[in-house]
UniProtKB/Swiss-Prot annotation:
EC numbers for this chain: 3.6.5.-
Sequence positions that bind Mg(2+): 173, 193
Stored HAMAP family: GTPase_Obg
Compartment annotation: Cytoplasm
Subunit structure, interactors included: Monomer.
Disulfide bonds: none
Domain Obg: 1-159
Protein task: An essential GTPase which binds GTP, GDP and possibly (p)ppGpp with moderate affinity, with high nucleotide exchange rates and a fairly low GTP hydrolysis rate. Plays a role in control of the cell cycle, stress response, ribosome biogenesis and in those bacteria that undergo differentiation, in morphogenesis control.
Group of enzyme by EC: hydrolase
Binding positions (ATP): 166-173, 191-195, 213-216, 280-283, 309-311
GO CC field: cytoplasm
Full protein name: GTPase Obg
Length: 329
């Protein structure tokens, strides 16, 4: 399934039904008064979070969402039927903004969360409303009002507690695949991961924690280079970051600084987020080189380094122990 995490849509609430002019015409009521009914309310447009959806793909080709109009009033003071609300399902984690102003309308984070994004127009008044002592046969009635119409920006931000970040080919996808049941595409070339991958990792209690493997960052990602800018938003909600470094890279210290710089440039307090620093592909390092690299990385980052080999399953228990400690579980 194609992963789409941004969409622009138009929502149009229903127009209110018109009021009408009518008079009582019973056989034994020769001077029947006004009886025109009111129009029904226009339908609202409502977004609803659905935990079964993972992408905004449904909005790629369908971008106009009109709610039904209210019906016109009837005689005998009958009010017209109101238009039914239009319910639009979106994934949990969807932010909704006005396209023109960028104003945040709502953030649908839990399944069944509801957000009214366009209100239906009010129904018009029938002539029965205008009966008075001075006017016993009013002919005045009003039309229904138009419903609201808005252009909206939908933005999906994944709901994961732990985000796995790093440069391309650092082994992030391999790591999430061995920690969870996720099966991302894995190969030995950059940008194998083109979309975020989610995996559920079991806590000691048996409960699940969602990990997200974010496509590799490169220098300039926060300004839109590579794939990073499109997907950095998906770690905004995380409680903990795991920064994976490639032990077989030419200069892991420089790689560390590149990602650190991108987190600072992107903002949203990502650089302040609790973070574990992980050196992957431990099996590629001899003991002397490993010791030197550990010292250099810890000095450059001010963090304790965790050594692992995701491919060989080394150091994973220690890594998870640190994750649970940071999350307080």
């Amino acid at each position: 399934m194609q992963f789409i995490d941004q969409a622009r849509i138009t929502v149009r609430a229903g127009r209110g039904g018109d009021g009408i002019m009518a008079f009582r015409r019973e056989k034994y009521v020769p001077a029947g008064g006004p009886s025109g009914g009111d129009g029904g309310e226009g339908g609202n447009v409502v977004l609803e979070a659905d935990g079964n959806l993972q992408t905004l793909l449904d909005f790629k080709y369908n971008r106009l969402f009109p709610a039904p109009d209210g019906r016109r009033g009837g005689p005998n003071r009958c009010t017209g039927a109101s238009g039914k609300d239009l319910i639009i399902k979106v994934p949990c984690g969807t932010e909704v903004r006005h396209l023109s102003t960028g104003i945040l309308l709502g953030d649908l984070t839990r399944s069944d969360d509801l957000l009214v994004v366009a209100f239906g127009g009010r129904g018009g008044l029938g002539n029965a409303h205008y009966l008075s002592n001075r006017n016993r046969a009013p002919e005045k009635f009003t039309e229904g009002r138009d419903g609201e119409e808005w252009f909206l920006q939908l933005e999906l931000k994944l709901l994961a507690e732990v985000g796995i970040i790093g440069l391309p080919n650092a082994g992030k996808s391999t790591l999430i695949s061995v920690l969870s049941a996720a099966r991302p595409k894995i190969a030995d070339y950059p940008f194998t991961t083109l979309v975020p991958n989610l995996g559920v990792v079991r806590r000691p209690s048996g409960d699940g924690t969602v990990f997200a493997d974010i496509p590799g960052l490169i220098a300039g990602a926060a300004q839109g280079a590579g794939l990073g800018h499109d997907f950095l938003r998906h770690i905004e909600r995380t409680r903990l970051l795991i920064h994976v470094l490639d032990g077989g890279a030419e200069d892991p210290v420089e790689d560390l600084l590149v990602v650190e710089k991108e987190l600072v440039a992107y903002g949203h307090d990502l650089v302040e987020r609790p973070r574990l620093l992980v050196l992957n592909k431990q099996e590629l390092l001899d003991e002397q080189h490993q010791d030197q690299l550990v010292d250099a990385l810890q000095a450059a980052s001010g963090r304790r380094l965790i050594l692992i080999s995701a491919a060989m399953g080394l150091g994973l228990e220690g890594l998870l122990a640190q994750v649970w400690k940071e999350l307080g579980v």
